């Protein structure tokens, strides 16, 4: 194996966005994969399951023989062509299986028979995964500054503008609230953690890093939860709180949740299906917090939402949404965040408008 494939180079592979031809079964890939990996399995889920059962009952030799019988002829040729095409597309890529074992070696051998010498990852995905976990733990020990503030304060934008800012919500593909989902589905927990680790490694490699700047998040962002090592550090971190006028927050929320989300849904699905998806998205966000609102208040706000959607559909105006958004902020989101922030009052080091906080960050 070349030096670049040895254990001490795993971080370099991740930092370089090295393309990975991941030959694990789809179910394994879905449970966790590295950024930049493409899944071109040696065996599909049912084939892998059959080989696993055979291994338990009859041993390694019988399982290997079964694998070769399952992946032969046209099936073998089709998969081989896919690996060849992937290598031609990514000539600096690597083969990767679970542990750098038989699957990646078999694919490597088959490719070599066609004249392609494709390297593989020693230790496989599990070695890269351990590297990602260790990197997150190590880099989370650096000082952290949190950006706090009520919904609509522009916290994410502020974080993105910092050279040492890490957009946790962007990595999670979710904006944190019940209305936070995007058109891109969230990654599995392991894939989210891997993506976060690579982002930390990249920023650390390219910045003179005094500290991380992160948004003040809870334990979870949608379906993804923050690594405990990072969460523990965030719980003790100083906080700069954005306190913008309510009207300005409303305009940010109008742009983000009504104008942009409507545009994104219709762009992705067309006018009719996109409108339906947009409507369902807003209804789902409200439905998700119905118990906290109380069923009567939930029903009232749902009626108001329906009227606002009808107005938006007929005239294009999003003004009607303010009739349910304003009480939702006043009665639910703002009191909830202020309660959470009060428990961390000792950690607050600065308060001011969005621009005040932006200027303060430049001076630090």
Curated annotation (Swiss-Prot):
<comment type="subunit">
    <text>Monomer.</text>
</comment>
<protein>
    <recommendedName>
        <fullName>tRNA 2-selenouridine synthase</fullName>
        <ecNumber>2.9.1.3</ecNumber>
    </recommendedName>
</protein>
<keyword id="KW-0711">Selenium</keyword>
<comment type="function">
    <text>Involved in the post-transcriptional modification of the uridine at the wobble position (U34) of tRNA(Lys), tRNA(Glu) and tRNA(Gln). Catalyzes the conversion of 2-thiouridine (S2U-RNA) to 2-selenouridine (Se2U-RNA). Acts in a two-step process involving geranylation of 2-thiouridine (S2U) to S-geranyl-2-thiouridine (geS2U) and subsequent selenation of the latter derivative to 2-selenouridine (Se2U) in the tRNA chain.</text>
</comment>
<dbReference type="InterPro" id="IPR001763">
    <property type="entry name" value="Rhodanese-like_dom"/>
</dbReference>
<dbReference type="GO" id="GO:0016765">
    <property type="term" value="F:transferase activity, transferring alkyl or aryl (other than methyl) groups"/>
</dbReference>
<dbReference type="InterPro" id="IPR017582">
    <property type="entry name" value="SelU"/>
</dbReference>
<dbReference type="InterPro" id="IPR036873">
    <property type="entry name" value="Rhodanese-like_dom_sf"/>
</dbReference>
<feature type="domain" description="Rhodanese">
    <location>
        <begin position="14"/>
        <end position="137"/>
    </location>
</feature>
<keyword id="KW-0808">Transferase</keyword>
<feature type="active site" description="S-selanylcysteine intermediate">
    <location>
        <position position="97"/>
    </location>
</feature>
<dbReference type="GO" id="GO:0002098">
    <property type="term" value="P:tRNA wobble uridine modification"/>
</dbReference>
<comment type="similarity">
    <text>Belongs to the SelU family.</text>
</comment>
<dbReference type="GO" id="GO:0043828">
    <property type="term" value="F:tRNA 2-selenouridine synthase activity"/>
</dbReference>
<dbReference type="Pfam" id="PF00581">
    <property type="entry name" value="Rhodanese"/>
</dbReference>
């Amino acid at each position: 194996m070349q030096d670049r494939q040895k254990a001490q180079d795993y971080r370099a592979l991740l930092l370089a966005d090295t393309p990975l031809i991941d030959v694990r079964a789809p179910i394994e890939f879905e449970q966790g994969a590295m950024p930049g990996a493409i899944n071109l399995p040696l065996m599909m889920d049912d084939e892998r399951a059959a080989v696993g059962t055979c291994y338990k009952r009859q041993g390694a030799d019988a399982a290997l023989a079964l694998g070769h019988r399952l992946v032969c002829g046209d099936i073998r040729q089709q998969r081989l062509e896919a690996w060849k095409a992937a290598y031609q597309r990514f000539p600096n890529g690597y083969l990767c299986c679970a542990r750098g074992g038989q699957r990646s070696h078999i694919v490597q051998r088959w490719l070599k028979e066609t004249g392609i010498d494709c390297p593989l990852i020693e230790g496989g995905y599990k070695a890269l995964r351990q590297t990602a976990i260790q990197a997150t733990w190590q880099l989370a020990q650096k000082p952290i500054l949190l950006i706090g503030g009520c919904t609509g304060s522009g916290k994410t934008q502020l974080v993105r503008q910092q050279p040492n800012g890490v957009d946790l919500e962007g990595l999670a593909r979710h904006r944190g609230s019940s209305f936070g989902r995007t058109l891109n589905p969230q990654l599995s927990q392991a894939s989210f953690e891997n993506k976060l680790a690579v982002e930390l490694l990249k920023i650390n490699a390219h910045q003179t890093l005094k500290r991380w700047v992160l948004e003040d998040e809870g334990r979870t962002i949608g379906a993804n939860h923050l690594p405990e090592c990072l969460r523990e550090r965030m719980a003790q971190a100083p906080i700069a709180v954005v306190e913008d006028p309510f009207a300005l927050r409303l305009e940010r929320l109008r742009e983000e949740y009504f104008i942009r989300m409507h545009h994104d849904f219709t762009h992705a699905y067309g006018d009719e299906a996109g409108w339906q998806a947009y409507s369902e998205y807003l209804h789902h966000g409200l439905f998700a917090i119905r118990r906290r609102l109380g069923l009567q208040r939930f029903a009232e706000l749902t009626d108001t939402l329906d009227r606002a959607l009808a107005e938006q559909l007929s005239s294009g105006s999003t003004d009607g949404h303010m009739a349910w958004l304003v009480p939702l902020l006043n009665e639910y989101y703002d009191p909830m965040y202020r309660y959470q922030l009060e428990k961390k009052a000792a950690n607050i080091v600065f308060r001011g408008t969005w621009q005040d906080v932006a200027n303060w960050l430049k001076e630090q």
